[in-house]
Amino acid sequence: MGQCLESVKWADEIIVVDSGSTDATVEICKRYTDRITVTDWPGFGPQKNRALAMATGDWVLSIDADEEVTPGLAQEIREVLQAPLAQGYTLTRLSSYCGRFMRHSGWWPDPVLRLFQRGAGSFTPARVHERVELEGSVGALQQTLLHHSFRSLDQVLQKVNHYSHEGALALHAQGRRASLATAIGHGLWSFIRTYLLQRGFLDGREGFILAVSNAEGTYYRYLKLMYLQDKAPRA
């Protein structure tokens, strides 16, 4: 968290919304801002909209705790906001996986809309895979937003469980249904897409590990959905 906040300390205001962390996150945040709100966890989209509602500046830069604005990107943002030509801008995100920055596997290039005029955009209410809905034109910045997404295998396993849970809840809310066969099929397809079609094999061993963890996450998402649709114990 400190690495993230250090990279944006040049901002006019820093707003942090914490969903009840039990480590030193809040204490770290206090070194950079007093605009800290501790609340429940309604999902990624609703949580980011809570933070957005607290903003007072003309422009909003939304980043997650595991992301870092590079000095080059910070300079590019400051320059473009002197005379903006669009209502929002995508950032070029480069993500790491267990110590390797991934240039394939469907992770690159990864443009994400994170810089936008306050009042012109908001986040979709999705629990996972939220995105900004913007009224107006979108430009593109060239410098890099670093995403330290998975620092270790332990974190991979934790996030597989978390995201599969959130994904299952989202699918269940949409009325989607699943079976063991669909869970297996979606998981297998996820591996094929990541490792072969998106050339994950060019990312070395981390490309293979990512393809397997993607398959696991997809498999468990639909498996959890299967049990959500019928919580009664099975013989």
Named regions from a protein language model:
Residues S21, P42-G43, E67:
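Alpha/beta-hydrolase active-site loop signature
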Residues P46-A53, D58-W59, I63, T70-A235:
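Catalytic-site signature of metal-activated, phosphate-bearing donor transferases
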Residues V26-M54:
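Conserved donor nucleotide-binding strand/loop of the catalytic core
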Residues T39, I63-A65:
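Cofactor-binding loops of NAD(P)H-dependent oxidoreductases
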Residues G2, D23-Y32, G72-L73:
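Acidic helix N-cap motif at the loop->helix transition within catalytic regions
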